């Protein structure tokens, strides 16, 4: 039986929030809820909080049409514990094992725990999770079989549908997980993952820097190489299932928009956790060079685009006025987080944490 903890579920750890309170088929007593969770986005990284070197028009819309918080706090300074608290309503420091999770960590939130998704599902909502997860998968750490349905996944936590990253973009495995199994699984390239030792014959960033054609590490992040970028942890295989970093935002956002379309006639809850602006920052080419801050600024612009795609979908389907949108970051900003992307050198007076 699931334990119910309501205390923190009503706490909005928000950067900008908009209540868009026309689809006549929807029950207005149950507004849709979209929780947008940015990664490592700072208070000062958005125009609505004073950013000058990057444009965020879609987030600006949320701020101008809704409520902009100027005093809000995350429960932790890193990803895993902050997300744990948000989804469970519990302080992470009360639970062992909620520090920054490896990509092969077992599922930290246990199926018997009552989650935010459970709360919405029990109220008749369709529930979906998209993007960065970083709370473990499978029943036990390092015991996952990535070539079969995972023994524990988001379906056990109240989510009807999920399309997520197992951990973060800088940690293996570099594949999407859809409803508890590797998306676009390639049987010709079975997946193996280790956070202890490399697999024989597999190149690493430390030993084969000549293979890092997309991004090089500034410190750490020198293990397995995927898409010309070295990561934390070791993996083998993946084949066609491996993501391309420049397409992560497109893929996550497209699946989220499809979810909105599929559930436009019923109340839905969406947990939309972007990879942006976490490292490795390798946004799509169409966002490159649009600001003064290099790749980190480009990643902020890409994040804003994702927000805009959700807003556009709601507008087109007449759902905007019956949808509550909450936007937050999991924690404060990180500038140099292990890759040589010139993020610090190109701040040009920008203050990610605000002033």
Show where each model-derived region lies.
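Formylglycine-dependent sulfatase
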Residues: 2-8, 13-15, 21-355
């Amino acid at each position: 039986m699931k334990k119910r903890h309501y205390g923190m579920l009503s706490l909005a750890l928000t950067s900008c929030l908009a209540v868009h309170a026309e689809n006549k088929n929807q029950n207005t007593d149950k507004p849709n809820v979209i929780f947008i969770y940015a990664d490592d986005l700072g208070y000062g990284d958005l125009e609505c909080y004073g950013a000058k070197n990057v444009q965020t028009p879609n987030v600006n819309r949320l701020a101008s049409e809704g409520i902009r918080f100027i005093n809000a706090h995350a429960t932790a300074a890193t990803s895993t514990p902050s997300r744990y608290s948000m989804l469970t309503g519990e302080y992470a420091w009360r639970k062992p094992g909620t520090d920054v999770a490896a990509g092969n960590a077992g599922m930290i939130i246990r199926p018997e725990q009552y989650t935010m998704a459970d709360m919405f599902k029990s109220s008749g909502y369709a529930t979906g999770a998209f993007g960065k997860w970083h709370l473990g998968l499978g029943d036990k750490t390092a015991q996952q079989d990535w070539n079969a349905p995972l023994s524990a996944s988001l379906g056990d936590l109240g989510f009807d549908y999920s399309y997520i990253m197992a951990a973060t973009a800088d940690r293996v495995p570099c594949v999407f997980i859809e409803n508890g199994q590797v998306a676009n699984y390639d049987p010709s390239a079975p997946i193996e993952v280790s956070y202890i030792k490399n697999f024989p014959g597999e190149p690493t960033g430390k030993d084969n820097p000549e293979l890092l054609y997309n991004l090089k590490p500034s410190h750490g992040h020198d293990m397995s190489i995927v898409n010309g970028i070295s990561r934390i942890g070791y993996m083998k295989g993946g084949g066609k299932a491996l993501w391309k970093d420049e397409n992560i935002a497109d893929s996550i956002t497209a699946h989220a928009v499809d979810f909105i379309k599929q559930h436009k006639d019923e109340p839905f809850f969406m947990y939309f956790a972007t990879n942006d602006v976490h490292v490795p920052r390798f946004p799509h080419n169409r966002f490159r060079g649009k600001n003064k801050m290099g790749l980190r600024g480009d990643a902020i612009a890409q994040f804003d685009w994702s927000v805009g795609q959700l807003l556009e979908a709601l507008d087109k389907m007449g759902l905007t006025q019956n949808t509550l949108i909450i936007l937050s970051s999991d924690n404060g900003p990180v500038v140099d987080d292990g890759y040589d992307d010139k993020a610090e050198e190109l701040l040009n007076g920008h203050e990610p944490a605000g002033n």
